[in-house]
Design a protein with these regions (language model features):
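Basic, polyanion-binding surface patches
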Residues: 1-171
Length: 171
């Protein structure tokens, strides 16, 4: 199968859209006065539950991406499931080649996770805080399996979906 054939066939599978977040470690972890690390976010559609006992979920990250590199050194991360009215957030964090995410978080309503320290969208359909249990290289991606530390359902409404190369909603 060619890459184009595979991509075209997989585009027919509707997927939920999530924001994966983590906080970079401080620049000098030995200095308690050192500024906190920067918050980082990435839009993803490959997030799924793996196990109920223990509670595990995974996200698939492009190997060598900024988030893949960060989660290789930072074991705590979070996921916010996006609602249908959060398409702008998905687009904002899907941009490639950006240097900093500081401005991307600036106008969003979020709180810092108590278990992960990562940003959690306050109006997401659901949020998860996770600790990496396993990393598996799979082709050009890394599957990051995390133990779910917290799971909350702060929002209501319908989910944001990704189907045939576009963001969509149910209905």
């Amino acid at each position: 199968v060619t890459n184009d054939e595979f991509r075209a066939a997989m585009s027919r599978l509707a997927a939920g859209v999530v924001l994966v977040t983590a906080q970079e470690p401080p620049l000098d972890p030995d200095d308690p006065q050192a500024p906190a690390g920067e918050d980082v976010g990435m839009t993803a559609t490959a997030f799924m539950s793996v196990s109920l006992d223990p509670p595990l979920a995974l996200v698939s990250l492009r190997e060598g991406s900024r988030m893949d590199d960060l989660l290789a050194e930072q074991p705590l991360w979070a996921v916010s499931i996006l609602a249908e009215n959060q398409r702008h957030i998905a687009g904002r964090f899907a941009m490639k080649g950006r240097i900093s995410d500081r401005l991307l978080f600036k106008e969003l309503s979020w709180t810092r996770g108590e278990s992960s320290g990562a940003p959690l969208l306050t109006d997401a359909l659901a949020t998860f805080e996770l600790r990496t249990e396993q990393r598996v290289t799979a082709g050009d991606h890394t599957l990051v399996v995390g133990r779910v530390l917290t799971a909350r359902v702060p929002g209501t409404g319908g989910p944001l979906l990704y189907y045939r190369g576009r963001y969509r909603h149910l209905g």
